[in-house]
Amino acid sequence: MARTVNCQYLKKEADGLAFQLYPGELGKRIFDNISQEAWSLWQAKQTMLINEKKLNMMNVDDRKFLEEQMVNFLFEGKEVEIEGYVPQKDDE
């Protein structure tokens, strides 16, 4: 049976992550409060950020920026802004 959490991003009960995917206290906070669905949404945004901003995950500043964006997205409800990206409309 899947573990459920009260997802802070989705604002509802949902299936939780199978295991802690991120290290440290932030990782525990994500594991305890973020659903698999919300994490998948973040992963898509993360990929776009890395690609569009040409982030280097070996660079400490780039990792710090990405972590800030993750916290803003998952816990503070702030949308990730990606310069030049225009979401596809449903009727296209």
UniProtKB/Swiss-Prot annotation:
General function of this protein: Could be a mediator in iron transactions between iron acquisition and iron-requiring processes, such as synthesis and/or repair of Fe-S clusters in biosynthetic enzymes.
Q: Which GO terms describe its biological process?
A: cellular response to oxidative stress
Q: Which family does it belong to?
A: Belongs to the Fe(2+)-trafficking protein family.
Which GO cellular component terms, listed alphabetically, does the Swiss-Prot or TrEMBL entry include? cytosol
Keyword set, alphabetical order: Iron
Give one GO term, molecular function aspect.
iron ion binding
InterPro entries the UniProt entry points to: Fe_traffick_prot_YggX, Fe_traffick_prot_YggX_sf
Please state what the protein is called: Probable Fe(2+)-trafficking protein
Q: Specify the domain of life of the species encoding this protein.
A: Bacteria
| Transmembrane parts of this sequence | none
- Record's Pfam families? Iron_traffic (PF04362)
Q: Which PANTHER family match?
A: FE(2+)-TRAFFICKING PROTEIN-RELATED
